[in-house]
């Protein structure tokens, strides 16, 4: 069958789609990836066939006032301490309004939706798998008669909150049932003769790649697949080719955005605290310039995460799904300094399961970070629990093993 994967131009989101794309390809299906032009190199680098459509989004160019409105519903989604608030009608409606006004229309811009629909109508895929922010994929699928599903790369917050919102909305008086996402999708789909249905918001089904302990209960039809992290095309650097006996810690992801790395002096103090670790600390990504670092600190712009973590005792990161999944896959303890979207939730879940420590970015400092590192490295129960989570993840079917199920669902939903 013909399978079309689609994503707005966000490299790490796309990377979460790659293992299943290759599983479908090696099963003999014709697979193409339609995305905004900025993603083309990443698609080609994954060895997949790219179809550039539309114009690139400008999500990160939104003005601070608008960003603040979105952040009210995307920062510190604390399921452990804000549960009642997060499930209130006011919060659920506010989230639907903010994302449907300031996020989804920006990443699904008019030219992207139109050109994706045109391509789908011409190529006639049997199945469209869409990244969960890329609602254009659902519209294109309905416009050409294909089956379609969301391919989740992280925690299903969109499906979870959409389900809670709809349940409360339908209990309200008929004259007071606003639906910002439904209204926006109705307008977008209507341009192509497609009527709104809830499948445009959540897919006809979803593919969830998180292990059982981390899945959110959405009540929706879901196909479970093993998390199999892909970190992008890469080359192993010389320093990582050998020295497998070297004891390492990895620090990665948004480090420069933390208060403990606000400037070069603060960054240097943080590194000095962490350098007490007996081994090498590899710090990836950008941080403030510093003229000197301790001898056991290695600063690098990029490193193949899957290779590095094979020889790490622990990782400190910002909670991103790809980094988190790679650490989970290798069974190492995680220290998550996270606050955005689903990053906080996974960090808290990992900590609750005894495989790491969660730290709030607005509370962490050099001392607390160094203390957390010492704790997860010296207490073997963190590694033991991380290995248990790895084993749990490995119990899920591989992407290749779910292909027959996807074929069956495609036959059921097509047309």
UniProtKB/Swiss-Prot annotation:
Q: What is its EC number?
A: 2.4.1.328
- Report if keyword DNA-binding is assigned: no
Encoding gene, per UniProt annotation: eryBV
What are the recorded GO MF terms, alphabetically? hexosyltransferase activity; UDP-glycosyltransferase activity
Q: Provide the reaction this enzyme catalyses.
A: dTDP-beta-L-mycarose + erythronolide B = 3-O-alpha-L-mycarosylerythronolide B + dTDP + H(+)
Q: Name one Pfam family in it.
A: EryCIII-like_N
Please give the coiled-coil regions recorded for this protein. Answer: none
Cited function? Involved in the biosynthesis of the macrolide antibiotic erythromycin. Catalyzes the reversible transfer of mycarosyl from dTDP-beta-L-mycarose to erythronolide B to yield 3-alpha-L-mycarosylerythronolide B. It can also use TDP-beta-L-cladinose.
Organism of origin is Saccharopolyspora erythraea (Streptomyces erythraeus)
Keyword annotations for this protein, in alphabetical order, are:
Antibiotic biosynthesis, Glycosyltransferase, Transferase
Other remarks on this protein:
It does not require an auxiliary activator protein.
Give the family, as the similarity comment puts it: Belongs to the glycosyltransferase 28 family.
List GO BP terms, alphabetically.
antibiotic biosynthetic process
**What is the name of the protein in this document?**
Erythronolide mycarosyltransferase
